[in-house]
Amino acid sequence: MPVDRRSLLTLLAGGLASPAMAQSSSPNGAAMSRVTAYAFSFAGLEGDAIRLADFTGKPLIVVNTASLCGYTPQYAGLEQLFMRFHERGLMMVGVPSNDFGGQEPGGVAEITKTANKEYGVTFPLAAKAEVVGPNAHPFYKWAASERPLETPKWNFHKYLVGRDGHIAAVFATQVEPMEARVVDAVARELTRIE
């Protein structure tokens, strides 16, 4: 029996399109896949909103921070990374969180003292927020949907958002900000053309 190529192509195209159609009609399907980091905002530590949309097209590191953590000295490395690449377009937002070990119990004054005065941080800091669980900030819920196996397990978990607004790389707590793999990933994103 001869095969009608047009019928076969139509059948194949229909079979391939069906899952895509089903995904786009689902509430968490294609519509969610179009959401990028640039859709979110954080309340700023000192009041002004930090709108990630203002960073559209620029690589962005979002890192959950804590003042009383053994990893708190990473603020210095984060600032060094920020200063190294900021003029080329890197943006960074620190998100103080008390989620892990209660290591960010203070308010604005304590967070500012640690980040700005002790470590010289110049990148924006958000208001204290939850980064895990049902009350997590919407950015962190989105990041968990983008990278479900790479969610924060402790303070100083780093998301690198690429120029396209999607997560390009994730660096766990123990990865120092100035390690070659972080520096290389940031440099790659800065040279990437959209």
Task: Please identify what each model-predicted range represents.
Residues 1-15:
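N-terminal secretory signal peptides and thylakoid transit peptides that target proteins
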Residues 141, 145-194:
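Thiol-/selenol-based redox modules, centered on thioredoxin-like
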Residues 55-70, 92-95:
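Short active-site neighborhood of thiol/selenol oxidoreductases, capturing the structured segment around
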Residues 23-53:
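N-terminal "domain-start" segment that seeds a small globular fold
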Residues 38-39, 127, 162:
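Terminal helix/beta-alpha structural elements that buttress the NAD(P)+-binding lobe
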